[in-house]
């Protein structure tokens, strides 16, 4: 840890690279009676991540952000090696938004060479939506988030609604494992033209960037139909698919309506429903979603 005492005194973000350093600092904070918030990230931060930090700062005395590209949530032929990274830029953003500490471990720090323990939800929740084409993804997510919970021992943890399935799965894991942690979901942050903020947006060419607007266009269409009284989830999904299919650079992975808590498929909108999608724009896989209960707000 670099200049931890001075960093705390001048309100500069602390950089921790080991589990021991994080635990020592959090112990000091908790001995002072301070509350701790956690914002897990894979780095290459944008305004969506900044909004999570802002929310955490507003609710907690100290905020820890993790900056770790977690290899266990990437499958074969996914973008682990090419995933964008810019740690110095991340630190500047975190400091600007009042983050207290960034945890930036190596893979070796987080996973022993012979690590053989994973955290996995055995219901159908991780098998729906993104899990259909990314079968090991949520096992990796649950494992790394569980490890971060054990390392940081936060009072609250903050996750974005853009990864809605992940948020639901983390809530279930916290319930099932009796973690004494409040999970706070935060709204999707969008570009001025509607595209959901994502680190993977940097993969898009200029033409693909324009084509990617079809995701938010489909979301806004779905929200409009719900506000107008549509309760047939199948009709809603069909209309959104037709919207996306009109874009020649778009290839649908899925568009689905599911129970917002269990992730089970639904045919009628008679409860809180998550309408989610994953769409390839060229070679880049993007996600977006909305909650039907938010449409009346």
Predicted regions and their residues:
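Nucleotidyltransferase catalytic core that binds NTPs
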Residues: 2-249, 258-262, 290
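Phosphate/ribose-recognition catalytic cores of enzymes acting on nucleotide-derived substrates
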Residues: 239-297
């Amino acid at each position: 840890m670099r200049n931890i005492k001075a960093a705390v005194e001048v309100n500069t973000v602390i950089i921790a690279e080991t589990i021991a350093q994080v635990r020592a600092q959090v112990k000091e904070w908790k001995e002072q009676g301070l509350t701790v918030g956690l914002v897990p990230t894979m780095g290459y931060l944008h305004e969506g991540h900044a909004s999570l930090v802002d929310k955490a700062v507003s609710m907690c005395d100290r905020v820890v952000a993790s900056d770790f590209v977690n290899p266990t949530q990437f499958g074969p032929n996914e973008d682990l090696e090419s995933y964008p990274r810019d740690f110095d830029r991340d630190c500047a953003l975190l400091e600007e938004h009042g983050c207290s500490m960034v945890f930036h471990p190596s893979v070796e720090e987080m996973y022993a060479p012979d690590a053989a323990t994973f955290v996995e939800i055995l219901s159908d929740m991780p098998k729906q939506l993104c899990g259909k084409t990314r079968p090991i993804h949520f096992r990796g997510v649950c494992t790394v988030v569980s490890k971060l919970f054990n390392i940081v021992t936060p009072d609250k943890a903050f996750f974005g609604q853009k990864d809605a399935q992940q948020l639901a799965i983390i809530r279930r894991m916290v319930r099932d494992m009796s973690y004494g942690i409040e999970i706070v979901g935060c709204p999707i942050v969008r570009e001025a033209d509607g595209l959901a903020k994502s680190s993977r947006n940097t993969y898009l060419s200029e033409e693909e960037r324009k084509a990617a607007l079809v995701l938010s266009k489909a979301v806004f269409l779905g929200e409009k139909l719900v506000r107008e009284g549509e309760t047939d989830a199948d009709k809603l999904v069909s209309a959104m698919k037709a919207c996306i299919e009109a874009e020649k650079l778009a290839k649908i992975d899925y568009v689905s309506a599911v129970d917002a808590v269990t992730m089970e498929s639904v045919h009628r909108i008679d409860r809180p429903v998550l309408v989610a999608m994953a769409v390839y724009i060229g070679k880049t896989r993007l996600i977006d979603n909305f909650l039907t209960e938010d449409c009346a707000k």
